[in-house]
A protein has these predicted regions:
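N-terminal leader/signal peptides at the extreme start of proteins
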Residues: 1-47
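Compositionally biased amphipathic helical and low-complexity segments enriched in hydrophobic
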Residues: 5, 14-15, 33, 50-53, ...
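Charge-dense, low-complexity intrinsically disordered segments
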Residues: 60, 76, 121
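Sec-dependent, cleavable N-terminal signal peptides
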Residues: 36-39, 71, 75
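N-terminal single-pass transmembrane signal-anchor helix
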Residues: 44-73, 82
């Protein structure tokens, strides 16, 4: 008609081009409105930069919350395990005393004072002696002498050993065949002291024995009251 091709209403509404066609039953304004709507739909089909930044920020916050919660759970679990181990070793020490009329004791345990020593690296000798006497493994080589009595069975993760020969943070040489000390759940050495057995009442805490974990803390020299409040201990 009049030299122009005609298009259907659907074709006219879908096109976004200017054509020299006659669109039967479709107004120009209707075509324009339909084209603008299609453009807006295409424009908002993807995330904007601001939206991406917001999403990344939310993910980062959630990841931080998960990590902090996991860290708290691990620390709480370690404290609970240390409390259980200290209670179990204390019971073993009572059994040892019943047989030997004294708690596990030597010059190393008599010389360690929980009041003045907050560095677990200083606990090694006393801790090793405690292991030898409670386990019966007096050579600390996993081969107790024949007839040796064991008062406590130490789990592998409680022992200062290593699958390969290495040096720990305290400078101790760890091997797979020898025990260097009793390890707490935080990776440090358990403290064990019998200093009040020497007759002093101004050092140490218990007249029997002191057994403790610094709960992951390392305090050079004398620990503060705040430090000791975080320890897991038998006093």
């Amino acid at each position: 008609v009049n030299g122009f091709a005609e298009m259907t209403k659907h074709e006219c509404l879908m096109t976004n081009e200017v054509r020299t066609v006659r669109c039967r039953g479709v107004r120009r304004g209707e075509r324009l409105a339909n084209w603008i709507g299609a453009w807006r739909k295409h424009r908002y089909a993807a995330f904007t930069l601001i939206e991406l930044i917001v999403v990344i920020g939310i993910i980062t916050i959630l990841a931080g919350l998960v990590l902090s919660t996991a860290g708290y759970a691990r620390k709480k679990g370690a404290r609970a395990r240390a409390e259980t181990e200290i209670a179990a070793m204390s019971a073993a020490l009572e059994s040892y005393k019943a047989d030997n009329a004294t708690y596990v004791r030597n010059t190393d345990t008599d010389g360690l004072d929980a009041q003045t020593s907050g560095n677990p690296c200083a606990y090694g000798d006393a801790s090793l002696y405690l292991y030898k006497q409670l386990s019966g493994d007096t050579n600390a080589n996993f081969q107790p002498p024949a007839g040796a009595k064991s008062y406590f069975t130490f789990k592998p993760n409680m022992l200062g050993t290593s699958p390969t020969t290495t040096t720990d943070a305290c400078g101790n040489t760890l091997t797979p065949t020898t025990v260097s000390y009793i390890r707490d759940p935080f990776g440090n050495i358990y403290g064990y002291s019998t200093i009040q057995e020497t007759g002093t009442t101004t050092q140490g805490y218990n007249p029997t024995f002191d057994l403790w974990s610094t709960a992951g803390l390392t305090t050079p020299g004398q620990p503060t009251a705040s430090d000791q409040n975080q320890w897991i201990k038998n006093w």
